[in-house]
Curated annotation (Swiss-Prot):
Keyword Repeat: no
GO terms for biological process, alphabetical: fatty acid biosynthetic process
Cofactor(s) in the UniProt record: Mg(2+)
Family: Belongs to the P-Pant transferase superfamily. AcpS family.
Originating gene: acpS
Assigned keywords, A-Z: Cytoplasm, Fatty acid biosynthesis, Fatty acid metabolism, Lipid biosynthesis, Lipid metabolism, Magnesium, Metal-binding, Transferase
Presence of the UniProt keyword Repeat in the record: no
Superkingdom of the source species: Bacteria
Reactions this protein catalyses: apo-[ACP] + CoA = holo-[ACP] + adenosine 3',5'-bisphosphate + H(+)
Residues binding Mg(2+): 8, 57
Identification of the protein by name: Holo-[acyl-carrier-protein] synthase
Main location: cytoplasm
EC assignment: 2.7.8.7
GO molecular function: holo-[acyl-carrier-protein] synthase activity; magnesium ion binding
Length: 136
């Protein structure tokens, strides 16, 4: 069953401006060490950071909290599966909110898609609950 859906559009130029103006102060407040490492490897850092920013906003919307109720930027981390597919790793208040959403006998699955077409980056998040089975 679908528990939450969130989407966000982010202006890449806005993120690039924040990177120029605030530098590490911005990236350390919003992004995890892993996200910063991945983004900083890229020649075009702005779109990479913007996609992740949009993912965090979309996730907060799917959780039903926005950036409040104990959910913070760094509680949501964009990571990649071995296949390269992006997904989200939740910690802290985001993980706690997710646990409150999931009915007994179910486990959460998070689905994430990211894209950009300058000047915009977009993310879409679906939170799904699936029954726990002996083979899960």
């Amino acid at each position: 069953m679908i528990l939450g859906i969130g989407t966000d559009l982010c202006d890449i130029r806005r993120i690039e401006s924040s990177l120029e103006r605030f530098g590490d102060r911005f990236t350390h407040r919003v992004f995890t060490d892993g996200e910063r490492g991945k983004c900083d490897q890229r020649a075009a850092r702005g779109p990479s950071y913007a996609r992740r920013f949009a993912a965090k906003e979309a996730c907060a919307k799917a959780l039903g909290t926005g950036m409040s109720q104990g959910v913070f930027w760094r509680d949501m981390e964009v990571v990649n599966l071995p296949s390269g597919q992006p997904t989200l790793n939740l910690t802290g208040g985001a993980r706690e909110q997710l646990a409150r959403m999931v009915p007994a006998g179910h486990e959460a699955r998070l689905h994430l898609t990211l894209t950009d077409e300058p000047p915009l980056a977009q993310a879409f998040v679906i939170i799904e609950a699936v029954p726990i089975t002996a083979t899960s």
